[in-house]
Amino acid sequence: MSWTIGRPDAEAPEDRMAASHLFTRLDDLVAWSRKHSLWPFNFGLSCCYVEMATALTPVYDQARFGAEVIRSTPRQADLLIVSGTVFRKMAVPLYRLYSQMREPRWVISMGACANSGGMYDIYSVVQGVDSFLPVDVYVPGCPPRPEALMEALVLLQSKIATEARPLQIRMGETGPARPFDPIPRRDALREARMAVTRLADPEAT
């Protein structure tokens, strides 16, 4: 590889311009192929999975987004849709399944329980799957309609189309991994949220 220094207004050599254009188009081609060939992993936890299974029927035609090939093994999938309540007992197997997926891989959190624990603010329920997995798209609802999952796939496709190559990868203890904030926003704002619900003592005033 050779480097040259020139003025900003100077014309670039034709061979360098052609190579740059080639790699730019190659990035676009790779992004296009990735976003139109998502292979979801068939994994459900509770009632939101029923809506996810409904989205796979011919009525909604998920094949339009290239995501109709449901995989039964994480080693052949690149999209994990977490649908339903994530109990602490299931967090470890879920993370193990995610770690078996090949890079690049993406995660969709489907439903209020997967997003933030939902109405189960108890010790046995993980308060948001983003506390141990890097979530790319959140789907609100209890349960969300299949159309909401369709919109999540479209949003994920637009995100994949703008990701640069190589993807944001850092070297971890077990190999390359995409960086993510391990502290979810729900936990960061928990104290402020709880302060709103505290009632003042009427005797103190």
From Swiss-Prot:
Bridged cysteine pairs (disulfide): none
Localization: Cell inner membrane
A single cellular component GO annotation: plasma membrane
Molecular-function GO term, any one: 4 iron, 4 sulfur cluster binding
Signal sequence range: none
Free-text comment on the cofactor: Binds 1 [4Fe-4S] cluster.
Any single Pfam family the record assigns to this protein: Oxidored_q6
Top-level enzyme category: translocase
Cofactor dependency: [4Fe-4S] cluster
Record keywords: 4Fe-4S, Cell inner membrane, Cell membrane, Iron, Iron-sulfur, Membrane, Metal-binding, NAD, Quinone, Translocase, Transport, Ubiquinone
Example of a GO biological process term: aerobic respiration
Documented EC number(s): 7.1.1.-
Binding locations of [4Fe-4S] cluster: C47, C48, C113, C142
Stored PROSITE patterns: COMPLEX1_20K
Catalyzed reactions per annotation: a quinone + NADH + 5 H(+)(in) = a quinol + NAD(+) + 4 H(+)(out)
Membrane topology: Peripheral membrane protein
Known partners and oligomeric status: NDH-1 is composed of 14 different subunits. Subunits NuoB, C, D, E, F, and G constitute the peripheral sector of the complex.
NCBIfam families for the chain: nuoB_fam, PRK06411.1
Primary role: NDH-1 shuttles electrons from NADH, via FMN and iron-sulfur (Fe-S) centers, to quinones in the respiratory chain. The immediate electron acceptor for the enzyme in this species is believed to be ubiquinone. Couples the redox reaction to proton translocation (for every two electrons transferred, four hydrogen ions are translocated across the cytoplasmic membrane), and thus conserves the redox energy in a proton gradient.
PANTHER family: NADH DEHYDROGENASE, NADH DEHYDROGENASE [UBIQUINONE] IRON-SULFUR PROTEIN 7, MITOCHONDRIAL
Sequence similarity: Belongs to the complex I 20 kDa subunit family.
Protein known as: NADH-quinone oxidoreductase subunit B 2
Species per Swiss-Prot/TrEMBL record: Cereibacter sphaeroides (strain ATCC 17029 / ATH 2.4.9)
Taxonomic lineage of the native organism: Bacteria, Pseudomonadati, Pseudomonadota, Alphaproteobacteria, Rhodobacterales
